[in-house]
Regions:
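Conserved AdoMet/S-adenosylmethionine-binding subsite of the radical SAM
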Residues: 1-136, 142-143
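Auxiliary Fe-S-binding modules of radical SAM enzymes
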Residues: 103-189
């Protein structure tokens, strides 16, 4: 068992998150966060230093495309992922880079290849976890009276031929990294 902090964005409350995870570690609980890594490095590190595993999202390597979809560029995120992959394993932690595959946004070969090459160049060979797109959040937007930003996109299932082709491309471009598809194949050891 263990404790996972996710969001929203856990780093928006980094001081509380860091103290919570410190107490968990003191009590021998496995600790994990899920983050976009969009925060100052010192905020991220205050939290990550107490984690056994950090799941970090890599949405797009092109900063303009990233900005168009998320509202922010990716420079801080890429820098933080790079530092995290260098620093966390020194403390016995593990980084898993997750690439959510959104049809028409980042699931073309060029975008996928750029992400795979980035991950392949990171220290300590983090796992690359490919996340098939799902539209489960659409109903939440409806409940709060907001427009869903990706209307009409269908969820993809784990063994979709396109997803398998993306996984094969990533395995070819990042041969020293474990490349998993969906959440069921993640190595947390």
């Amino acid at each position: 068992g263990g404790v996972t902090l996710s969001g929203g964005e856990v780093l928006l409350q980094y001081e509380v998150a860091a103290e919570t995870l410190r107490l968990c570690r003191t009590n021998y609980l496995n600790t994990c966060i899920e983050t976009s890594a969009y925060a100052p490095w010192d905020h991220l590190w205050q939290v990550a230093q107490y984690c056994h595993t950090v799941f970090v999202d890599l949405k797009h390597m092109d900063s303009a495309q990233h900005q168009a979809m998320t509202g922010v560029g990716n420079g801080v995120i890429l820098d933080n992922i790079t530092r995290l992959c260098r620093e966390l394993p020194r403390r016995g932690g593990k980084v898993i880079v997750r690439m959510p595959l959104i049809p028409g946004y980042n699931d073309d070969d060029e975008a996928v290849a750029a992400g795979a090459r980035f991950v392949a160049g990171l220290e300590n060979a983090p796992e690359l976890n490919l996340l098939p797109y799902h539209n489960l959040g659409e109903s939440k937007y409806e409940m709060i009276g907001e427009d869903y930003p990706l209307p009409g996109l269908a969820s993809r299932k784990g063994r979709d031929p396109r997803l398998l082709a993306i996984q094969a491309l990533c395995q070819r471009l990042a041969p020293h990294n474990r490349v998993s598809l969906g959440g069921d194949a993640i190595d947390l050891t």
